[in-house]
Amino acid sequence: MVPFMRILGIETSCDETAAAVVERNAEGHCNVLSDVVLSQLDEHSAYGGVVPEIAARAHVEALDELIEQALKRANVSLADVDAIAATSGPGLIGGLLVGLMTGKAIARAAGKPLYAINHLEGHALTARLTHGLSFPYLVLLVSGGHTQLILVRGVGQYERWGTTIDDALGEAFDKTAKLLGLPYPGGPAVERMARDGNADRFDFPRPLVGEARLDFSFSGLKTAVRQAAQDIAPLSDQDVADICASFQRAISRTLKDRIGRGLQRFKREFPATGEKPALVVAGGVAANLELRATLQALCDKNGFRFIAPPLSLCTDNAVMIAWAGLERMATGVAPDTLDVQPRSRWPLDANAETLIGFGKRGAKA
């Protein structure tokens, strides 16, 4: 039986600075002792997106104090912690350096093992923390940097079934919002405007719908939104609402096709898993209610459980990083050495083909 374990988690991959202390008992159950997150929204909102240098500086200024807060709220000291888990990628390299170097320093000073965690693995394993989910299951990761459909076979065993060939879904939301003059972050702003819009007004494209492969594409949709806005400029509030509603509908129908095919593939490959199969949604875009409703209906139709962890655990947080470290410890994975380096790109499925899209970000993890 795996012994009781406690770990300090650190997350600095983008624009949230976070620290958490999490326990895992012998039966595999989780207890979150503390969860501290500091958002950098105010620092980046004026620029309409995350500025890497500003993000890195903010992590430097905040991280030490957040770690102290996490330990204090958990009522533990470093002596009571069994290991350190820090995000090592993928993400913005400046932020990753801050978090990983801090984790290394703590591990060295306190004599604790270090686990360098893939941020995507944190998202992929969160449902085991919140719902005690058994392997295998599917994860749809939708965020500002990633849109991936991942098969989770076990800890450290991941297959990427689909990914974006250009823009991530969260990126498409943010750029659409900026185009329409809406505030950052764009996802919530677009969702709010869409509530009062006519989704039938614009027939936006649904890229890759009908194709057998399970990849995604959103750059063409973004271009169609720009063209529609230019055609009817200047835009009234109702025009903006209608564009947002039509944009969301196109995304919902795209996901319905892409994920629906993924669910069917899962049932073919795992015809009898012993329990109802599950689809987990994670990432900041998972907060979108229309997206959740679409996925819930799709799961109901196909006989799947639909699992959406609490929003605080869908967006970037250190709890999931600590939990991923605990899962790795429990399965006997050796800790990392102190010469481990951060990686701005770090595919969760090391065997997956690198896709080259047409977005500004180049190769997609």
UniProtKB/Swiss-Prot annotation:
The keyword Amino-acid biosynthesis does not apply. One of its GO terms (cellular component) is cytoplasm. Keywords: Acyltransferase, Cytoplasm, Iron, Metal-binding, Transferase, tRNA processing. It is an enzyme of class 2 (transferase). It holds the Pfam family TsaD. Required for the formation of a threonylcarbamoyl group on adenosine at position 37 (t(6)A37) in tRNAs that read codons beginning with adenine. Is involved in the transfer of the threonylcarbamoyl moiety of threonylcarbamoyl-AMP (TC-AMP) to the N6 group of A37, together with TsaE and TsaB. TsaD likely plays a direct catalytic role in this reaction. This is tRNA N6-adenosine threonylcarbamoyltransferase. It comes from Rhizobium etli (strain ATCC 51251 / DSM 11541 / JCM 21823 / NBRC 15573 / CFN 42).
